[in-house]
A protein has these predicted regions:
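Extracytoplasmic electrostatic interaction patches
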Residues: 104-174
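General helical structural elements
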Residues: 6-7, 98
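Bacterial N-terminal signal peptides
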Residues: 8-16
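Acidic/polar, low-complexity intrinsically disordered N-terminal segments immediately downstream
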Residues: 23-105, 110-116, 144
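Positively charged n-region of N-terminal signal peptides that target proteins for export
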Residues: 1-4
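C-terminal motif of bacterial Sec signal peptides marking the signal peptidase cleavage site
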Residues: 18-20
Length: 174
């Protein structure tokens, strides 16, 4: 009787483990993936006649790539703006996202401070640019969910990491 009970318990434990494994596999097999982005949106009117603004924009790109590498531990060989997570569930992805948010905010602040330094150093040249010559950057951090069927992903969470603005101030005569 004891042997039958132990055998039944073992079969139950193995079948429960098998069912649990199958449930995990099915959630992994649906193709849902999560990715983190630290990036910026830009609104600008920058031309070859505004080299300082072009330099600032190029510096913003460079610093953002460096920030992505620092945040995710990637390399310049990979696309640093798309950091796929190992998380298979939205809950796990959000937990990883929350760990990186504070780091991303401080990276955004560092980038904005560096760009403001460039803005101050070049204030005289920028003042000579027409008013419509401008550069506005919005730094942000996003958690994106996507499946093979999606053309673009669904934003699950996002955090604003700061803004940078610079514009010429010269009145243009018409």
């Amino acid at each position: 009787m004891k042997r039958i009970f132990l055998t039944a318990m073992a079969v139950f434990a193995v079948s429960a483990m098998f069912v649990s494994c199958n449930k995990q596999e099915s959630s992994e097999d649906d193709g849902t993936k999560y990715a983190l982005f630290f990036n910026y949106g830009t609104k600008s009117h920058v031309t070859s006649e505004t080299p300082v603004l072009s330099d600032i924009l190029n510096k913003a790109k460079e610093l953002t790539v460096e920030a992505d590498i620092a945040l995710y531990g990637g390399t310049k060989k990979k696309d640093p703006f798309v950091q796929e997570l190992s998380a298979k569930t939205e809950k796990d992805a959000k937990a990883e996202y929350n760990k990186l948010v504070e780091k991303a905010k401080s990276k955004g602040a560092e980038i904005i401070a560096e760009l403001n330094k460039m803005k101050e150093e070049n204030a005289a040249a920028i003042a000579e640019y027409p008013k419509d010559m401008h550069l506005n950057l919005d730094f942000g951090f996003m958690l994106l969910k996507y499946t093979p069927e999606m053309i673009s992903g669904e934003i699950v969470a996002e955090t604003d990491c700061g803004k940078f603005e610079v514009a010429g101030s010269k009145e243009v005569e018409e």
